[in-house]
Amino acid sequence: MKRRGAIRLIKKAAADRRLTFTSHALDEMDEEGETRESVASALRHAESFALQENGRWRIHGVGLTAIVQVDDAAVIVWTVFTG
């Protein structure tokens, strides 16, 4: 999938609350005091998207960074951290 399509899919999934969270992401969110809604909002409004060598996207949103995978129509949040 091309960059523009991946970004569009990530933002749409975040807006529609169709994100899948790994157990690791949920644990990290709990530690950081983040919610599914705050992560979705950060992804929806993010402006920095970097494709990593492993095929996952490093996304810098307002107040947090998320690592996500775009898998066909699914957007999987692998981890979340602040900063």
Tell where the protein language model's regions lie, with residue ranges.
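Ribonuclease/tRNase effector modules and their secretory precursors
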Residues: 1-83
